[in-house]
Amino acid sequence: MKKTLIIGVTGGSASGKTSVSHAILETFSNERIAMIEHDSYYKDQSHLTFEERTKTNYDHPLAFDTDYLIAQLKELQYGRAVDIPIYDYAKHTRSQETYRQEPVDVLIVEGILVLEDERLRDLMDIKIFVDTDDDVRIIRRIRRDIEERGRTLDSVITQYLEAVKPMYHQFIEPTKRYADVIIPEGVSNTVGVDIITTKIASILND
């Protein structure tokens, strides 16, 4: 069985990780390729009240059920389909729904902390860090969380100052040293994206 190529894409919140991941997906649209978001593996908090959920630090490694992600990645590597959880950002907990992911040749794993856990890093063939200026990221995050995730401006700013920014410097930025490639400014860095896609193509063609 052909080994699944696993690509980790990380960086700070709103750094452009998803855009870089989608650029890879589009480049290899004729291949069996898929993307899994680490956000899907936020721990189930249905046992907590909504107010308690809003106080969770979602940028801390303990907010994620990374063991579950690792287990499902291994299942996919063995050629077995998995049911991936869906996270509800508005309710701050895991949805009761899942989606079916079949085995693929190329799997992108995207999220702010996908390089933080050594066990997860060890599953990856290519590790990418998207490096974007803090000011750009906070502006993007405000727009995204208000428009797409039903958040208020005050809640976004409070979360950024109390959790997002300090967690970035404590947990996310240090993982840059594990990256094989660092892409400044995300998908707008076409040279960086081209280098990545060229490397992926060479591996697939071996």
Swiss-Prot record:
GO terms for cellular component: cytoplasm. Gene3D superfamilies: P-loop containing nucleotide triphosphate hydrolases. It catalyses: uridine + ATP = UMP + ADP + H(+); cytidine + ATP = CMP + ADP + H(+). ATP binds at residues 11-18. It is found in: Cytoplasm. Its EC number is 2.7.1.48. InterPro entries: P-loop_NTPase, PRK/URK, Uridine_kinase, Uridine_kinase-like. GO terms for molecular function: ATP binding; cytidine kinase activity; uridine kinase activity. The keyword Cytoplasm applies. Pathway: Pyrimidine metabolism; CTP biosynthesis via salvage pathway; CTP from cytidine: step 1/3; Pyrimidine metabolism; UMP biosynthesis via salvage pathway; UMP from uridine: step 1/1. It is an enzyme of class 2 (transferase). The keyword Nucleotide-binding applies. Belongs to the uridine kinase family. HAMAP family: Uridine_kinase. PANTHER family: URIDINE KINASE. This is Uridine kinase.
